[in-house]
Curated annotation (Swiss-Prot):
Coiled coil: none annotated. The chain crosses the membrane at residues 1-13, 27-54. Its EC number is 7.1.1.9. It is a multi-pass membrane protein. Mg(2+) binds at E165. Belongs to the cytochrome c oxidase subunit 2 family. GO terms for molecular function: copper ion binding; cytochrome-c oxidase activity. The lineage of its organism: Eukaryota, Metazoa, Chordata, Craniata, Vertebrata. It comes from Tinamus major (Great tinamou). Residues 55-198 are mitochondrial intermembrane. This is Cytochrome c oxidase subunit 2. Its cofactor is Cu cation. It is an enzyme of class 7 (translocase). Cu cation A2 binds at C163, E165, C167, H171. NCBIfam families: CoxB. The gene is MT-CO2.
Amino acid sequence: AICSLVLYLLTLMLMEKLSSNTVDAQEVELIWTILPAIVLILLALPSLQILYMMDEIDEPDLTLKAIGHQWYWSYEYTDFKDLSFDSYMIPTPDLPTGYFRLLEVDNRVVIPMESPIRMIITAADVLHSWAVPTLGVKTDAIPGRLNQTSFITTRPGIFYGQCSEICGANHSFMPIVVESTPLPHFESWSSLLSTSSL
């Protein structure tokens, strides 16, 4: 619509059907400033609504809250009663053979595979960012604000990530390890963890 209007006015100018009074008229300038603005607003409003609808997950099988601290992560499984833990990087001298240095944690995030997972992410002190590239997830953790993301793992495995927002001296020592397991394994893990934390 905008291109058609511009081409039409250009054709009229080339054919000299517009006088110099019309070419310099403020009415024409006002129209071709306001008309594109209206078209852009009409395009933006439905797009914003769709953008927020895409971010919402209707019925997740599991909701997990991640809280960034200097310099570790806390996790709360909000669908379970009193199921929460802190996740610290394992120091290199304590690392078992075969584990990745600077990437392994003492408590992994365990999730059921092939289940929609909603992550609610925040921070307790400074800006952090919960990022697991192999899951396609990177969400900022901001103090006083809850950010949300969702994902589904299609296979069992271990997925590594890290805080990707510079948050202080030990920023590089905030690894994230997500372990995707079949549902029966997840259920036994969660019941074992909730029993041991009581």
